[in-house]
Swiss-Prot record:
<feature type="region of interest" description="Disordered">
    <location>
        <begin position="226"/>
        <end position="530"/>
    </location>
</feature>
<feature type="region of interest" description="Disordered">
    <location>
        <begin position="27"/>
        <end position="69"/>
    </location>
</feature>
<protein>
    <recommendedName>
        <fullName>Myb-like protein M</fullName>
    </recommendedName>
</protein>
<dbReference type="Pfam" id="PF13921">
    <property type="entry name" value="Myb_DNA-bind_6"/>
</dbReference>
<feature type="compositionally biased region" description="Low complexity">
    <location>
        <begin position="389"/>
        <end position="415"/>
    </location>
</feature>
<feature type="compositionally biased region" description="Low complexity">
    <location>
        <begin position="555"/>
        <end position="593"/>
    </location>
</feature>
<feature type="DNA-binding region" description="H-T-H motif">
    <location>
        <begin position="90"/>
        <end position="114"/>
    </location>
</feature>
<feature type="compositionally biased region" description="Low complexity">
    <location>
        <begin position="611"/>
        <end position="636"/>
    </location>
</feature>
<dbReference type="InterPro" id="IPR009057">
    <property type="entry name" value="Homeodomain-like_sf"/>
</dbReference>
<feature type="compositionally biased region" description="Low complexity">
    <location>
        <begin position="234"/>
        <end position="382"/>
    </location>
</feature>
<feature type="compositionally biased region" description="Low complexity">
    <location>
        <begin position="450"/>
        <end position="464"/>
    </location>
</feature>
<feature type="domain" description="HTH myb-type 1">
    <location>
        <begin position="60"/>
        <end position="118"/>
    </location>
</feature>
<keyword id="KW-0238">DNA-binding</keyword>
<dbReference type="GO" id="GO:0005634">
    <property type="term" value="C:nucleus"/>
</dbReference>
<feature type="domain" description="HTH myb-type 2">
    <location>
        <begin position="119"/>
        <end position="170"/>
    </location>
</feature>
<feature type="compositionally biased region" description="Low complexity">
    <location>
        <begin position="483"/>
        <end position="521"/>
    </location>
</feature>
<keyword id="KW-0677">Repeat</keyword>
Length: 669
């Protein structure tokens, strides 16, 4: 075994110089007292025994005393009992011993001292080398080491290792080297390193015991590891050997230190490399994570932007579609409204023309009283006031023509239907109808006094001639209304007969009188306060007559309000026309408490009315008399006339009179 293996061991055990291995292994009393199992395991060992520090002893009179040493008699008796009972029944052996020794003490003393398997004496170089190897492997586990080393106890192994450490700590002196070399040369072939160790211990050149392995190692160092025999040593050689041995030892120490430093440097380098690798790994990991996060965020933002763009495009497209639909819907609604307004205006215009034509037809044949006859349930009318009715019908005809022209102009300018105000209709009550051939039946007087449409004096006397209509007041008869408001020239009847109230000549004369008035009777005039302007006129709309007031030329308004004014006045004229056709020449007026100011819209200009009226007359004059609606009555009217009980009237003569061109020209003029 080399010196380096010995020097690497831990040198923490200090052994006194008085330690003598020969005395330990050869004196059995020391083995029993100082190095027995009892001293090692149970209690400490002192040189001076005392009852307070000793272990268990004999019990005498109830008091334990200090144990005695193992005597030769006790050793022989223990040897005999173990041979009889074996190495397992230690309690029984202790009882056989007389109770002075316990079973544990008997077992330890047998295994460590008296057992024939235990090898006693010093350790040779081979056992010591094996011990050092086992200590390097197992450390301080002495029981394990003792099992590997045959015939040696754990205590022997421990003390031998401590002795070898102590001998290596003390340096060799030159005298020891001379005795070592000399003794080896003397022994020659019968060389035993154990005997050399014992010989050096007897000389006592030093206070340290040299083991057999240490003597062998020192001799190999002195001889140069070749085993050659050196020349005889003197003092100078011994000093040189000492210096050389010290140098070799120092070199070994330096070598070991260098190796340790190199190992430390390598460890430091490895640690640095490991740290760099860890840092690189962490940096790479962080960079990868950052790149991944950035890529993900960029992709997510791009997707959001694309989605927003798509959503905006969709919204724009949707808004465009909605705008197109709204525009189309608005255009369609406007077109439909325009079409409806045009159709309504055309229908109203046609109805107004038809109504005016039917009125002209009735007026040309002096059939104005027959309109009330057709709608009445009685047999014959009274012929009183026919002249007044003819005049009113002529006025209504002219007013309707003017209103039709105005409506046509307004419809061309504005495509909106007129707002016609229609008051509650005043139905006339026709009474006292008699047949010309039969005797007249007197009619019963009315239960209520008749009413007529008059104008208040406040409106007639206004200097601005606004001609507004107020609430009508009752009058005794239609003649009073005629004398106060309407100024018409009266002509005497050309023919006289018993029945002068109704005749064809009277009808013709009355019609001629109406035509000679220069169409002044179409409008109601007011003669008070020097204002000769027309006050109102008759207008027919949808089969009903209304009174329409006419403004002065100075009070001109927009044409957009003419349609409403005409329609409101048509309702009034319808009531007046029906009241004029009453058999008793009276008007049945349903009075109410409301004012007529709400029924009076803005009036129209007289110049425009006259121009429209002239145009209408010119258009009528261009048509042939036979083809005009005035030339022949309607079939329905003829059937109604035939169904009544009027046997005094011949329709053929009436058609003949209507076909005369002279009468038609007079009506047109």
């Amino acid at each position: 075994m080399t010196e380096s293996l010995i020097m690497n061991n831990i040198s923490k055990y200090n052994i006194s110089p008085q330690f003598n291995s020969d005395r330990i292994y050869n004196d059995p009393s020391l083995m029993d007292d100082e190095f027995s199992d009892n001293e090692y395991d149970l209690s400490p060992k002192d040189d001076v025994p005392s009852p307070s520090k000793r272990g268990r002893g004999q019990i005498q009179n109830g008091i334990r005393r200090s144990p005695n040493k193992w005597t030769e008699e006790e050793d022989q008796k223990l040897f005999q009992l173990v041979s009889i009972y074996g190495e397992k029944k230690w309690k029984r052996i202790s009882a056989e011993m007389g109770g002075q020794k316990t079973g544990a003490q008997c077992a330890q003393h047998w295994k460590r001292v008296l057992s024939p398997d235990i090898r006693k004496g010093p350790w040779d170089e081979d056992e010591e080398e094996l011990l050092l190897r086992l200590v390097n492997q197992h450390g301080s586990s002495w029981k394990k080491i003792a099992k590997r080393i045959c015939k040696r106890t754990d205590i022997q192994c421990r003390y031998q290792y401590l002795k070898s450490l102590q001998s290596r700590e003390v340096a060799w002196v030159p005298k020891e080297d001379e005795v070592l070399v000399k003794k080896v040369d003397e022994m020659g072939e019968n060389l035993s390193w154990l005997e050399v160790s014992e010989y050096l211990a007897k000389l006592k050149h030093t206070n340290t015991l040299r083991t057999a392995l240490e003597c062998k190692t020192r001799y190999l160092q002195l001889t140069g590891k070749g085993g050659s025999i050196l020349p005889p040593l003197n003092q100078s050689n011994v000093s040189s050997l000492n210096s050389s041995s010290a140098n070799t030892f120092n070199q070994q120490l330096q070598y070991q230190q260098q190796q340790q430093q190199q190992q430390q440097q390598q460890q430091q380098q490895q640690q640095q490399q490991q740290q760099q690798m860890n840092n690189n790994y962490n940096n790479n990991y962080n960079n990868n994570n950052n790149n991944i996060n950035n890529n993900y965020n960029n992709n997510h933002n791009n997707q959001n932007n694309n989605n927003n763009n798509n959503h905006n495009h969709y919204n724009n497209h949707y808004n465009q579609m909605n705008n197109n639909n709204n525009n189309n819907h608005y255009n369609n609604n406007n077109n439909n409204n325009n079409n409806i307004n045009n159709n309504n205006n055309n229908n109203m215009y046609q109805m107004n023309n038809n109504n005016s034509n039917s009125n002209n037809n009735n007026k040309s044949h002096n059939l104005s009283p027959l309109s009330s006859i057709i709608d009445s349930n009685t047999s014959s009318p009274s012929f009183e006031g026919c002249e007044d009715n003819n005049n009113n019908n002529n006025n209504n005809n002219n007013n309707n023509n003017n209103n039709n022209n105005n409506n046509n102009n307004n419809n061309n300018s504005n495509n909106t239907p007129p707002n016609i105000f229609r008051p509650l209709p005043h139905k006339p009550v026709v009474t006292g109808l008699t047949s010309p051939t039969s005797s007249p039946i007197p009619s019963s007087p009315p239960l209520t006094p008749p009413t007529s449409l008059t104008l208040p004096s406040s409106t007639l006397s206004s200097p601005s001639c606004n001609n507004s209509i107020r609430q009508p007041s009752p009058s005794p008869s239609i003649k009073t209304f005629k004398s106060t408001i309407v100024s018409t020239p009266s002509r005497p009847s050309p023919s006289s007969s018993t029945n002068s109230a109704f005749s064809i000549n009277n009808i013709i004369d009355s019609e001629n009188n109406n035509n000679n008035n220069n169409n002044d009777n179409d409008n109601i005039k007011v003669e008070d306060n020097g204002c000769n302007e027309p006050v109102m006129k008759k207008v027919r709309s949808n089969g009903e007559f209304y009174y329409q007031p006419i403004k002065n030329k100075l009070n001109n308004n927009n044409n957009n309000n003419n349609n409403n004014n005409n329609n409101n006045n048509n309702n009034n004229n319808n009531n007046n026309n029906n009241n004029n056709n009453n058999g008793n020449n009276t008007l049945s007026y349903n009075s109410d408490n409301s004012s007529d100011d709400d029924m009076l819209p803005k009036l129209k200009n007289n110049k425009q009315i006259l121009s429209n009226f002239k145009n209408h007359n010119n258009n009528q004059s261009n048509t042939s008399p036979m083809s005009s609606p005035i030339s022949s009555p309607h079939q329905s009217s003829i059937e109604k006339l035939k169904a009544t009980s009027f046997d005094f009237f011949k329709l053929e003569s009436l058609a003949t009179l209507a076909s005369q061109s002279q009468i038609v020209n007079e009506l047109v003029n």
